[in-house]
A protein has these predicted regions:
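Residues embedded in well-ordered secondary-structure elements
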Residues: 18, 34-36, 83, 237, ...
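Domain-terminus/edge residues, biased toward the C-terminal soluble/receptor-binding domains
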Residues: 161-162, 173-411
Length: 411
C-alpha cells in the first residue's frame, strides 16, 4: 500500500468491535472451584451483590409470598423518598389516629390523640417493627393507609419489583399483599444506595420511646452476631413464616441475603449466615471503569476536532468467582462511522463485559465532549477522504484505555 493510501486508512479509526484486554493491578490467584450453594431451609431465598445486583445463589426467589414485616422496608423507603424531596421533615409532629393506636401486632406503643416526631416514628418502624408507627407514618404522608399503599406500589413498579403488591404499610396478612425474596433484596439494595443516611437506622440495636421502661431491641439478631451486618429487617406472621433480609459490608463489598418462609427464628438466622459466608468466600467484586473514564477515542467525520473521547456515566463494578478476574474480557462496540455534530452525553456505542461468553454487563458509551460540525470546505474534504478511504483504506481498532482493578483483600 502506498504511503498516501496508508495515511488515508489511518483516518478510519471506528470499528464494529474493538477488543479491550482487562489487566489486574496485582497478581490473581488460581481460579477456585465454586461449590454449589449451601443447603437452605427457607422456602425461598436469594444472595446478591448489593452494588452490582449480581445474583450469586437463589431458589424460587421470584415466588410471590407473604412478606410480613419486610413490608416496612418499603414503608421506610417511601418515607425516605418524601424526605429527600422536601415534602416532609424529620421534625414534623405526626398526629396519632385511633386506627394507628389500635393496629395489632408488634408495637412502638404510641397513644391515640398524641403527636410524635416523624424521626421517632421512623425508628419505631425500622428498629422495633411497630405496626402502629407504620400506620401513623402512612397516614401522615398520604392521608390514608390505602393511599400510602398506592404510593408503595408506584415505587415498586419504578424499581422493577415484578412480584410485589402492597395493600398496607405494616405487612399484616392480606391475600392481596405479597412480595418475593428477589424483590425484597432489590428494594433493600436501592434503599442502601439512594438513602444511605436513612439506612443507618437499620443498624441501631435498640430504641426506647416515651415512658416505656426498657428499650425495645432490634429483631435482627445478626446485628449482634456479625459485626459486618448493618441491616435490614425481619418479618413474622403465621402465613409468612420467619423472614429476613440482611446486608453485610466487608472490605468494600456489600452482599444482601433474603430468606422467606423459614420455620424458626434460628433457621432464618442460620440460613442468612450461611449465604453470607458462601458469598464472601467464593466471589469478589472489582471496579473496572470509573465514571467518565475515557475508554476509546474514535474518529469523527465532519467535525472541528478529529476524535471524541467516550466513556460511561457510572463506575462499573463486576462480581465474579474468586480468581476469575483475569478471564474477563470487554468489547467496545462502535458504529463504522461517527458523524458530527455530537453533543456531550450523546450515545456513541456500548462496552460489553463477558466471562465465558456470558454477558455480565453492558453500558452505553457516551461522548465526553461536544464536537461541532466543521465548515463547508472542511466537510467537502472529509467527503473526498471517505471516498478514497473506501477505495484504499482499511479499518483499524479505536484507541482504548486499559482498565485496572485492585484484587480485593481476603475476606
Amino acid at each position: 500500500m502506498s504511503s498516501s493510501a496508508s495515511a488515508i486508512g489511518d483516518r478510519f479509526r471506528t470499528v464494529a468491535a474493538a477488543a479491550v484486554v482487562l489487566a489486574a493491578a496485582t497478581v490473581q490467584g488460581a481460579p477456585e472451584i465454586v461449590p454449589d450453594p449451601p443447603s437452605i431451609s427457607a422456602k425461598s431465598y436469594i444472595l446478591m451483590d448489593g452494588t452490582t445486583r449480581t445474583v450469586l445463589a437463589e431458589r424460587d426467589s421470584g415466588e410471590p409470598l407473604p412478606p410480613a414485616s419486610l413490608t416496612k422496608i418499603m414503608t421506610s423507603y417511601v418515607a425516605a423518598a418524601e424526605l429527600a424531596a422536601g415534602r416532609i421533615t424529620l421534625d414534623d409532629q405526626v398526629p396519632i389516629s385511633v386506627k394507628a393506636w389500635r393496629t395489632s401486632g408488634s408495637k412502638m406503643f404510641v397513644r391515640e390523640g398524641t403527636e410524635v416526631a416523624l424521626s421517632e416514628l421512623l425508628r419505631g418502624v425500622v428498629i422495633v417493627s411497630g405496626n402502629d408507627a407504620s400506620v401513623a407514618v402512612a397516614e401522615y404522608i398520604a392521608g390514608a393507609e390505602d393511599a400510602f399503599a398506592d404510593m408503595m406500589n408506584r415505587h415498586a413498579k419504578d424499581l422493577g419489583l415484578t412480584s410485589t403488591r402492597f395493600v398496607n404499610s405494616s405487612g399484616l396478612p392480606d391475600d392481596g399483599h405479597y412480595s418475593s425474596a428477589k424483590d425484597m433484596a432489590i428494594l433493600s439494595a436501592e434503599l442502601i444506595e439512594r438513602f444511605p443516611e436513612h439506612y443507618r437506622l437499620y443498624a441501631e440495636k435498640s430504641f426506647q420511646y416515651g415512658e416505656i421502661e426498657r428499650p425495645q431491641l432490634n429483631r435482627n439478631r445478626l446485628l449482634w452476631r456479625d459485626k459486618s451486618v448493618d441491616g435490614v429487617k425481619t418479618g413474622l406472621t403465621e402465613a409468612a413464616g420467619y423472614c429476613l433480609v440482611v446486608s453485610a459490608l466487608r472490605e468494600g463489598t456489600r452482599l444482601i441475603a433474603a430468606v422467606m418462609g423459614a420455620t424458626s427464628d434460628e433457621d432464618r438466622l442460620r440460613d442468612a449466615q450461611k449465604l453470607l459466608a458462601y458469598g464472601f468466600r467464593y466471589f469478589e467484586t472489582h471496579d473496572l471503569y470509573d465514571h467518565g473514564e475515557p475508554l476509546a477515542n474514535p474518529w469523527v467525520w465532519y467535525g472541528t476536532v478529529e476524535n471524541v473521547a467516550v466513556g460511561i456515566d457510572e463506575t462499573l463494578r463486576i462480581t465474579v468467582p474468586r480468581g476469575r478476574y483475569d478471564d474477563l474480557s470487554a468489547v467496545i462496540d462502535l458504529p463504522d462511522e461517527i458523524m458530527a455534530p455530537i453533543a456531550a452525553g450523546d450515545r456513541v456505542g456500548v462496552v460489553r463485559v463477558t466471562l465465558d461468553d456470558e454477558i455480565l454487563a453492558e453500558r452505553d458509551l457516551l461522548a465526553r465532549s461536544e464536537v461541532v460540525e466543521s465548515g463547508f470546505f472542511a466537510r467537502r474534504g472529509d467527503d473526498i477522504e471517505r471516498f478514497m478511504g473506501g477505495l484504499f483504506g482499511d479499518s483499524a481498532e479505536a484507541d482504548a484505555n486499559v482498565p485496572s482493578a485492585e484484587a480485593p483483600a481476603d475476606q
